[in-house]
Amino acid sequence: MFELSDWQRRAATQRFIDQALIGGRQRPAASGATFDAIDPASNRLLARVAACDAADVDAAVAAARRAFDEGPWARLAPVERKRVLLRLAELMLAHREELALLDSLNMGKPVMDAWNIDVPGAAHVFAWYAESLDKLYDQVAPTAQQTLATITRVPLGVIGAVVPWNFPLDMAAWKLAPALAAGNSVVLKPAEQSPFSALRLAELALEAGVPEGVLNVVPGLGEQAGKALGLHPEVDALVFTGSTEVGKYFMQYSAQSNLKQVWLECGGKSPNLVFADCRDLDLAAEKAAFGIFFNQGEVCSANSRLLVERSIHDEFVERLLAKARDWQPGDPLDPASRAGAIVDRRQTAGILAAIERAQGEGATLLGGGRQLTINGSDNFIEPTLFGDVRPDMQLAREEIFGPVLAISAFDSEDEAIRLANDSRYGLAASLWSDDLHRAHRVARRLNAGTVSVNTVDALDVAVPFGGGKQSGFGRDLSLPSFDKYTQLKTTWFQLR
């Protein structure tokens, strides 16, 4: 369908939006400051983007507040907001190539992953929430004969949304779709590594009919724009996907400002358990490789810990090493590449340091581990597998956010569960077993928000996504996500 040359030609002429969108207008940062947006796969400067700070966040929040208090969006009938959001989903698909290319150039992912997964997935999220709007009902409480008590969901007001760089368009959609569907106004702060698809999405939202000021985008550095959003007294709720350490800052910002609601989806160190009664070890090995090497391992729910029953350990690892060879990184614009570039030099350096530290801790390097240079960029790392990993090693405990897998053996079901749950994170887990009783037992005991049985990292917009412990709280996707963007309102009527 596409060739490398097709994507290269489009990349050569791609337009990059380099200004904030505030109140329906594109504008530079008030300070005039910019930051460089770099293609990690080539080290090419793509654009110098407005570096928003507190002054720009103030303007964006003021525009969002005016749109909410005075504009039509929050007061439209659900079916009217539905029509606008469905139109936005259609426009996203109409601009599928452009949006896919923006994310690929911006953060290094294979462009065909963005084309096949990210863009249609993000459009589907908008369409799903749009379709849900006229199918949600409020309640009437069973009160006394002379009273009527209604329980309704109402929008919160102004939502601050801070999203990461690993799935820029998808993560924006996960926050924006339910927030806008519920009638809120939003100020979106994309990661500084990947602002372009969010800025283009905001343009498309205006074209679809989202009123000016309802969706504002403030690119900028986290310690400036993100912090200002977290501290702003006119922001009613802050939703965040990113690292646990940054998530903790947003909790502090809420306490220091207006006690705004904060919803966090943070990191993970997700286990993948393979029991000896799994009959299709080849499939399990294929999925285990996908679970850690897809998107260069830059996935919050990546299955970065592999726990294998000792009786099949050696055979399974041999199969897995063969599957890992399919995930060698390549040019992200080459449709044949299954893995691309690491997002930037800082992340690359962090992954390489983790690999070196793991060897110093005594883990056995089974495969990969090398930094590669492709197209003049050294932001490429081989799929890396370590064996003999003890639970006290940093490799088993800290999120690396890269293509690095920690492999350990276990001797019993109880030991497997103990090792799996021995983590400060609780986002996701996978397990492989053909014993239905065991699958149910183990799934119930795993401390994770999502457990995938005989697959890895299962996901659908109709199913809530999120975790516990230091992976955060609250749920993205599905109907429960409306809880983050609405509040219950009780209204009493005294009847005569």
Regions found by a protein language model. Name each.
Residues 44-48, 235, 328-329, 355, ...:
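Conserved C-terminal structural/oligomerization subdomain of aldehyde/semialdehyde dehydrogenase
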Residues 237, 245-390, 453:
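ALDH superfamily catalytic-core signature
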Residues 1-42, 67:
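Hydrophobic face of amphipathic alpha-helices that form TPR/SEL1-like repeat modules
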Residues 46-136:
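Glycine-rich loop-to-alpha-helix module at the N-terminal edge of alpha/beta enzyme cores
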Residues 24, 43, 81, 103, ...:
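Residue-level signal for inorganic ion chemistry
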Residues 185-187, 365, 450:
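A short hydrophobic/small-residue beta-strand
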Residues 137-283, 410:
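Rossmann-like NAD(P) dinucleotide-binding subdomain of oxidoreductase/dehydrogenase enzymes
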Residues 46-52, 69-73, 161, 272-276, ...:
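Short, well-ordered beta-strand elements within core beta-sheets of diverse protein domains
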